[in-house]
């Protein structure tokens, strides 16, 4: 990051990133302590906009956005259908100082006046606040993680769990991954999916 900024600082408009590395079928990597604070400091100094992709992580880490948990303040945040419990809707939220620039850009869409997803989003957000959804999903995730690890140990299996509790990734550690793939296939045959990132929902218990 620093070397790129140093080399191209006058050509960089924004820094776009997910809050942490969370590919669907690989170990997740959380940011090191101070990572986002450093990104924030440099971007502020160089007048670079920070854009966070919270489509997958939005509301799972904190209802105020994943950035709150990682202690930084992005300029723009992208959110997806999770804000409406699966209804087709997305949102780009940001700081007030960007509104003037946004108003200069023509932007239109077929679904702009589709009231059902908007009503669903309001109802979903209200419900998430009411039930403290983030705490609930983290509780389920931690419970699943501890029980899965305990069960794996009883069979002398090294189960690696990465990511945040509300969306963990499970992987059996072995040299050629053969055991992991057999486990995944067997789970699928029983209608249980561990092929990729395990995203918890408040209805899971």
What are the language-model segments listed below?
Residues 45-46, 155, 190:
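Helix C-cap/helix->beta junction micro-motif
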Residues 75-78, 102-110, 129-132:
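Short beta-alpha connecting loops at secondary-structure transitions
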Residues 141-145, 152-186:
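Conserved PLP-binding catalytic core of the aspartate aminotransferase-like
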Residues 196, 200-205:
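Single conserved hydrophobic/aromatic residue that forms the stacking wall/gate
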Residues 124-146:
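Structural signature of PLP-dependent enzymes
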Residues 14, 18-32, 48-70, 76:
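Conserved PLP phosphate-binding loop immediately N-terminal to the Schiff-base lysine helix
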Residues 72-101, 113-120:
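Active-site PLP attachment segment
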């Amino acid at each position: 990051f620093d070397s790129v900024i140093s080399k191209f600082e006058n050509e960089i408009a924004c820094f776009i990133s997910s809050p942490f590395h969370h590919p669907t079928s690989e170990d997740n990597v959380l940011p090191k302590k101070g990572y986002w604070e450093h990104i924030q400091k440099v971007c502020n100094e160089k007048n670079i906009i920070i854009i966070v992709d919270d489509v997958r992580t939005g509301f799972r880490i904190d209802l105020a956005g994943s950035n709150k948990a990682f202690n930084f303040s992005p300029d723009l945040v992208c959110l997806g259908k999770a804000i409406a419990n699966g209804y087709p809707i997305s949102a780009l939220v940001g700081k007030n100082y960007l509104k003037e620039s946004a108003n200069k850009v023509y932007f239109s869409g077929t679904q702009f006046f589709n009231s059902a997803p908007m009503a669903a989003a309001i109802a979903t957000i209200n419900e998430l606040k009411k039930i403290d959804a983030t705490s609930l999903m983290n509780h389920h995730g931690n419970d699943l993680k501890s029980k899965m690890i305990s069960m794996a140990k009883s069979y002398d299996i090294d189960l690696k769990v990465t990511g945040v509790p509300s969306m963990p990734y499970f992987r059996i550690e072995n040299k050629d991954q053969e055991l992991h793939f057999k486990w995944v296939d067997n789970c699928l045959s029983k209608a249980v999916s561990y092929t990729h990132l395990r995203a918890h929902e408040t209805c899971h218990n």
